[in-house]
Structures are given as C-alpha cells and as structure tokens.
C-alpha cells in the first residue's frame, strides 16, 4: 500500500512539474509573439536603419567626423534646404582629390512626408551623389531639435551600379538646419562600373557657414518625386 501511494505521489509531482515547465514555455512564447506583433519604437527604428546601412559603415562615417543623433522623437524636418558652402570634412578614399576644406557645388536636399509611426521620410537631393540615384528606403532618428536622416541609394555610373548609404544630420532651428553635415559611403559594389569608389569608402561634408536655410527645390531637374528619386550633378560626391 505504501509503495502504491508513493508511486501515485511521484506521478502527481511529475505532472505538476511538467505543467509548470509547460506554463513557463507557453508564457515565454506568448511574450515573444506579442513582442513581434507589437515591437517598440526603438525596435522599429533599429530594424529600419539596419536595412539601410550596416553598423560597420555607420562606424566608418563616424570615424570621418559624421554625427549620429539617436532617439525616436526627431523634430519635423519637412522642407528644402541649401548646403552652402558645401565643404569636405574628411574622406577615407586613397588619393582623394577632394581633401578637407575643398568646397563642392552647393548641396540641396528636400525632405518630405515624415512619419512619426514608422520613422520613414522621403528625400530628394542635388549634388550629393550623382545622376539618376534612387532612394530605396529612408529613415529618421533623433530627439529634441537634433536628427539624422538615413537613405539607401542605388546609383548608376559607367555601365554599372552601386548601393550607397547617404546620411544627413543637423539641428532644426526655426526654418533652418544648424550644423548640417552629410556623409556618403559605398555599401555594395558587387555590380560596379569603372572609376567608382569601392565598398567601404566614403566622404563627409558639411555646411561651411553652419546654417542651411530654406530654398526652392526644383524637382523637375532631379527626377520624379513620386518614385522617391535622387539626382544631382554627376560625380560630385562619389
């Protein structure tokens, strides 16, 4: 009789232990599923940025002096802005003719349709990368008045194409952007043509008077806005 009772108690104990383990597993699975269904703002933004530029290339640009403004509460930056004098800050391109202090053609950027729910934003540019560059995906981070815009651009040149990351940071100040700075870096040169910078190479340039004021942006000269197309003077910044 005692042996039977012990066996029954052991069976009950094993059953309770199994139920406890199963409950923990189900709870963990439910939490994981819930996180996938309702990701945090940080998770949404991090994923979007990772789809644009690998972290190693973010690190490369910051080593060249580019500033990343993190956060999920960027200011609204819709508008068109002029970078003048658009001045080279640094480069990691061997024998680059564009040395620090070199003044490029004026840079123009148009930012529009900024979203506070998924941190997307549309962007058009002149004199940043080259002709017929297409923005594949964009994102914006920041907090307070400071922000960073991230764009992935497919640029065609000399019979091939490359994917570049184009980043721009600054501080919104009324209708202006203060301390505007831009960086480009080649993130995929697997289909490149001749005379194009290699993967991992890039440049950083800034607004030399530290104030990028509002400007008229003639989209007819840079492509079709509905397709989120970039275009600028060829070969200026690549």
Task: List each language-model region with its residue ranges.
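C-terminal motif of bacterial Sec signal peptides marking the signal peptidase cleavage site
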Residues: 26-30
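A short, structured loop/turn motif at beta-sheet edges
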Residues: 113-117, 138-146, 171-178
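Amphipathic/hydrophobic helical signal segments and adjacent flexible N-terminal regions
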Residues: 32-98, 213-238
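Glycine-rich, aromatic-bearing surface loops/beta-hairpins
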Residues: 163-238
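N-terminal glycine/threonine-rich, aromatic-flanked beta-hairpin/loop signature
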Residues: 86-135
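Short, surface-exposed coil-to-beta transition loops
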Residues: 104-107, 131-136, 160-168, 180
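Bacterial N-terminal signal peptides that target proteins for export
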Residues: 3-18
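Generic short beta-strand segments
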Residues: 82-91, 124-126, 148-156, 165-167, ...
């Amino acid at each position: 009789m005692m042996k039977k009772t012990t066996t029954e108690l052991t069976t009950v104990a094993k059953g309770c232990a199994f139920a406890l383990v199963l409950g923990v597993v189900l709870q963990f699975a439910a939490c994981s599923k819930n996180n996938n269904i309702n990701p945090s703002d940080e998770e949404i933004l991090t994923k979007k940025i990772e789809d644009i530029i690998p972290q190693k290339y973010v690190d490369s640009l910051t080593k060249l002096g580019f500033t990343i403004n993190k956060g999920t509460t960027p200011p609204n930056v819709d508008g068109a802005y002029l970078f003048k004098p658009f001045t080279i800050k640094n480069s990691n391109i061997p024998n680059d003719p564009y040395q620090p202090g070199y003044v490029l053609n004026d840079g123009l950027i148009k930012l529009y349709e900024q979203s506070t729910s998924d941190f997307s934003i549309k962007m058009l540019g002149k004199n940043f990368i080259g002709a017929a560059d297409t923005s594949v995906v964009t994102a914006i981070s920041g907090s307070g008045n400071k922000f960073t815009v991230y764009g992935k651009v497919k640029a065609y040149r000399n019979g091939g194409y490359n994917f570049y990351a184009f980043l721009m940071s600054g501080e919104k100040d009324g209708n202006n952007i203060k301390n505007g700075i831009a960086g480009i870096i080649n993130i995929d040169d697997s289909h490149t043509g001749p005379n194009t910078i290699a993967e991992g190479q890039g440049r950083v340039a800034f607004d030399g008077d530290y104030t990028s004021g509002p400007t008229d942006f003639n989209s007819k000269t840079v492509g079709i806005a509905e397709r989120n197309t970039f275009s600028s003077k060829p070969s200026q910044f690549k």
